[in-house]
Amino acid sequence: LPIGFCILLLQFDAPVPIAVLTSEPDRHYRIDQGAEMAEQQASASSIVLAEPSLLNLSGFEDALAKGWSPDPRRQQDNIYVEAELAALRYDRAGFLARFTSGDIVATSVSDRAPQRLVIRSFWIWDGEFCGYITFRHLPGTSQLPLHLPGHVGYSIVPWKQGRGYATQALRLLLPIAEQAGFERISVICNEANLASRRVIEKVGGVLYRTGADPSDDPDTIKLFFWLATLSGL
């Protein structure tokens, strides 16, 4: 582990333990288990990242029921939101698996066979569900399938926005990317999305390209940032 980091493992009797990642002023990196611990740490550190489980899926469900779209590209798409809510209620375990298992996809590297996408998804948690953040990558390469806009995806529910949660969550994700072997990751946002741009720049994002991305409408201009992990600083 890099200097300034430590790991603390705590055992709980919860039937399906969750991992909680939290940053503290001394920059320690701590992994706790259990939904109750998540709530305790949230009150002390503003937010934590909690691994999705059947124990905390109800927060995601409640957000969908309020009209939140987990896909930032499909805001105000009520048909999509209702379909997601119906899918969750029909098969909760199957819906949850979408956040923990990646599809087998073709890479953009011509000499590599199709690989399974690695997905690390977390709920953003302050004592209740605030949104999610995901780190996705292909083993052995920093390149991504064309349909994915960068290594990171996130969304904050509207009633939790404006509190700095996205910035904190992105910072908490960097040690996870570092553990996967990345010195830097690609983070993308719409040119018109000033809030997301501020989030990325606050965490140290460096703009390296502006233009369209195959993951979205060709008329939508994107900003492409490199974001260094601790090993890349």
Where are the regions a protein language model picked out?
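Short phosphate-binding/catalytic loops that engage adenosine nucleotides
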Residues: 165, 182, 205
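Conserved acetyl-CoA-binding loop-helix of GNAT-fold acetyltransferases
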Residues: 154, 162-175, 198-202
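Loop/helix-junction capping segments adjacent to catalytic residues or to phosphate/diphosphate-binding pockets
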Residues: 57, 163, 194
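Hydrophobic adenine-recognition pocket in adenosine-nucleotide-binding enzymes
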Residues: 156, 189
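GNAT-family acyltransferases
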Residues: 4, 8-12, 17-151, 158, ...
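Conserved GNAT acetyl-CoA-binding A-motif
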Residues: 179-188
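Conserved active-site alpha-helix within GNAT-family acetyltransferase domains
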Residues: 192-209
